[in-house]
């Protein structure tokens, strides 16, 4: 459900800027964050606590192999984990508002204050990792979205002859052409903040939980976390 909060925040320019920056007191107290959390919380409560879990591994298994979960909020990866009997019935989709969440972290970076020799080696490594050769393997073997946009994903998918890989190519195309692409907020706000939001949403899934009161409690938790 934190992905829903993430996507709703990204649906406005102000909210997107907040998600792409460190969490601040202004963000915690903003209308954008309140709206995103409460909207997700109401959806969770309507869905019911019996359909809520923080065990992502089990949730993925229920979706990929058993077909007991209707929607999985996940990145464009793990196509190989989908059971062959379910591949034809699974379709990729973006969040409402044509929003895509980039689940990658900070990417590749070169440290400051290194010697020219080390800096040159580091840049060579980045050049290699982002090369078409390596990026094709990231798509076909790692089954993730390559950062090199020159890679022809559809051609690779067709060559593979694998339906799941073809669905992966479709998912990557949707993400790459989304109207709004935003970073996963746990990389900017921190995993501890993400966990606090998830816990609050799980509590809100219980029938009768006062969402407004739980949000006020969450605000206090987050302000304490960011000090």
Where are the model-predicted features located?
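C-terminal capping/gating helix-and-loop segments adjacent to ligand/active sites or protein-protein/ligand interfaces
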Residues: 102, 166-221
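Glycine-centered hinge/linker elements that transmit conformational signals in sensory
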Residues: 22-53
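Extracytoplasmic/periplasmic solute-binding protein
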Residues: 1-25, 69
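Short helix-initiation/N-cap motifs at beta->coil->alpha
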Residues: 50-65
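Pocket-flanking alpha-helical
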Residues: 61, 78-85, 223
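Alpha-to-beta junction loops
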Residues: 65-74
